[in-house]
Amino acid sequence: MIPLDPAQRAAELRRRLQEANYHYHVLDQPRIPDADYDRMLRELDALEATYPDLATPDSPTQRVGHTIATAFSEVRHTVPMLSLNNAFSDPEVLEFVRRITARLGETAPSFSAEPKLDGLAISLRYQNGIFIQGATRGDGVTGEDVTANLRTLPTIPQRLQSDTWPTVLEVRGEVYMPRPDFEAYNTQARLRGWKVLANPRNGAAGSLRQLDPHITAQRPLSFYAYGIGEVADDVSFHSHSEILASLRAWGFPVSPLVELVYGSEGLLNYYRRMETIRDTLPFDIDGIVYKLDDLSGQHEMGFVARAPRWAIAHKFPAQEQTTTVEAIEIQIGRTGAATPVARLTPVQVAGVTVTSATLHNADQIARLDVRIGDTVIVRRAGDVIPEVVAVITDSRPPGVTAWSMPMACPVCGSEIVRETGAAVWRCSGELACPAQRKEAIRHFVSRRAMDVEGLGVKCIELLVDAAVVHGVADLYHLSLDQLLRLRLVTNAQTPTMLLREARDHVTGMRYQQLEEILRTVGVDLSGEGDVPEHWQIDVLRAQWPDFDWNHKKIATKWAQNLIAAIDRSRQTTLERFLFALGMTHVGETTAKALAHSFGDLAIIRQLPWPLFKCVPDIGGEVARAIGHFMDQPANQQAIDDLVERGVRITDAHPPTSTLRDQLTLASLLEHLEIPKITPMRAVQLATLAPTLPLLAEADLDALLQAGVPQPAAQSLTEWFQSPDNISLARRLQHCCDVLLAQLPSPDRAHTAPLNGQSVVLTGKLASLTREAAATRLEMLGAKIVGSVSKKTSFLVAGEDPGSKLDKAHALHVDIWDEARLLDFLEQYSAQ
């Protein structure tokens, strides 16, 4: 007799697993993490093993997936597409190998090991070398006919190569979406207003279930073959590795990571290696599949109800787990972006304790409907910040209310605003907001910006909180005394400890002044009262007496190194400086493009936003962001302060000649984004007046008489009726004229001395950085490449050049030393 509780539990587990199967396999909308599904399946499997009468024919332990969706016709698999048993620990893998060695009598059998892709399993059927049908796994016995969609995948051969294939061949494999392609697709989807894909796995599954193959063809899907189903008798195999080799020969892509390993040690070593590189792979994997390589051994091992005994999936630690949202807080970034963050009940995800996860923005919270108190699925992959990916609404407690963005910044109290059509809310406090100042400074000193080594996040927070540093320019006024004072206070865990440590550096009246500072900030020196929470910050904000630092009692080398690093950063390149400013939408690539095109900070900081569209790959949104930044008096003052403190651009140069075509009147009209003014209409309007201010004087009748269509003519005249637009047009024309006057003559532009030449730089240059040298060479037409080849025109070799110099010698590539480079640059900078 089966006890009631196990029977009820088994029924509940079956119901929940079947519901999860339906959402996962049919709707492509997973409701629970894979780890939760695996736990429930193992629990049900254990119950059915203990009480065999509980097992039912439709139990999830007996079947692979769910019944097929009704949108596609059914395909019955000639050879069932079975699932694999899972191993979650090394002992389970050892037991898997032990069973095989005991049955086959081999001490170290060979296994085929390969990553387990997180995609959609499919079966491809070929007759006489021609692809005739493709189907999903479905429930393992019956799948969905997705032939038309699979034909759109370029990685699936429509006709097999060579002539050794069997007359009938079923190939099993995985359709997946590479992560870079997934991210690129979503970027385009957002720009075009399409629905974004939730994750690569859902993207692959949903793409194959599109009723319109044209939609599938737009999705970046790939395929790897990993086995076979039905095969005609005219071809036979002896091992799984032989099967994979044949599949490659017939034109199927097979994972290059497949390896033949031996015994349990080989399996676990492979697992460790793949676990190490997992997050660097261009596709998602959730474990490793081990298959006994010898086919006769596979036959002898046989099957259990739902899986082969000769194969197993060794799963990685789960990258998704469920937990509870305890609070939703707002973090303020360097550009003022207000990012909601979920504070979570601590949970282990991929081996790391996660206590918070990003919610990205308010729209994402609304889409997921995340509420405080909800049970959510949290995902963490590699170094990626943990994120909430789904809400388990069935577990929502009663009475929880929808979340809304607060109207005030939690740091400075300024209004939080959102521009029309934008996804991001921002604190309007700008540099008056301490949170934005901290993030702006952290970005400014980062390695790819001004590269100030030794100034960490904690130090930046203390410098800002203590009002020692108000902006990035203040870094260049930091003194050894200020930094040592900072270290002395922060190392002291209590006021008493601070006074004790201070005796090594100050005595007499100055020591009494320090005691008075502590009393002023609320510290009871008798030790009986409570210590104020922020006493260290308050002490640092006070006016200190002079200290005679005893260098034997306090470390000073770190402070000296930091001041030296700050001093070195005064000499920088234009692209580094622009990137360091932290303008919205301006990353390294955009900063480099701006520096290459305009060449001079004095030019860039005066330009109106439309002229930034002259730079390749900069559109209206980015151009407006740069223009807005440069139009703010506080930002111009910050640049002035940096220049005043000795920051110098070492690679300034005239604007590039390629700007000329972007500075015509027709181009300026396009850049202004006036409604109804198409590129063709802009060319027409440019024939009516030589400059923007003169074109602004044309009235509607004059435009109509000149043949300009009514909608365009009316839109233009209405646009010029705005005083702000008139002012913008005049400023734009003036800056355009200034740029044109500074451009190289057309003759010189066509005779760049390094046009078409590939140049490699290696080693350290004494007179300028390699970045600066590369920029100067690019201005003269060179293409800078990273490796030496026969096509390399010349190699610039500084100190400690390394292997590139050896390769250049071997290939007889021309080699320039620094003196020759400087002579060349000086020769052409003078022209």
Curated annotation (Swiss-Prot):
Enzyme class: ligase
Reactions catalysed: NAD(+) + (deoxyribonucleotide)n-3'-hydroxyl + 5'-phospho-(deoxyribonucleotide)m = (deoxyribonucleotide)n+m + AMP + beta-nicotinamide D-nucleotide
Domain BRCT: 749-831
Coiled coil, from the record: none
Job description of the protein: DNA ligase that catalyzes the formation of phosphodiester linkages between 5'-phosphoryl and 3'-hydroxyl groups in double-stranded DNA using NAD as a coenzyme and as the energy source for the reaction. It is essential for DNA replication and repair of damaged DNA.
SMART domains, per the entry: BRCT, LIGANc
Binding site for NAD(+): D34, A35, D36, Y37, D38, S83, L84, E114, R137, E174, K291, K315
GO cellular component: cytosol
Keyword NAD: yes
GO molecular-function terms, A-Z: DNA ligase (NAD+) activity; metal ion binding
Transmembrane annotation, as ranges: none
Keywords attached to this entry: DNA damage, DNA repair, DNA replication, Ligase, Magnesium, Manganese, Metal-binding, NAD, Zinc
Active site: K116
UniProt keyword DNA damage, yes or no: yes
EC number: 6.5.1.2
GO biological process: one example: DNA repair
Entry protein name: DNA ligase
Binding residue positions for Zn(2+): C409, C412, C427, C433
Cystine pairings recorded for this chain: none
Cofactor entry: Mg(2+); Mn(2+)
Recorded family membership: Belongs to the NAD-dependent DNA ligase family. LigA subfamily.
Pfam families: BRCT, DNA_ligase_aden, DNA_ligase_OB, DNA_ligase_ZBD, HHH_2, Nlig-Ia
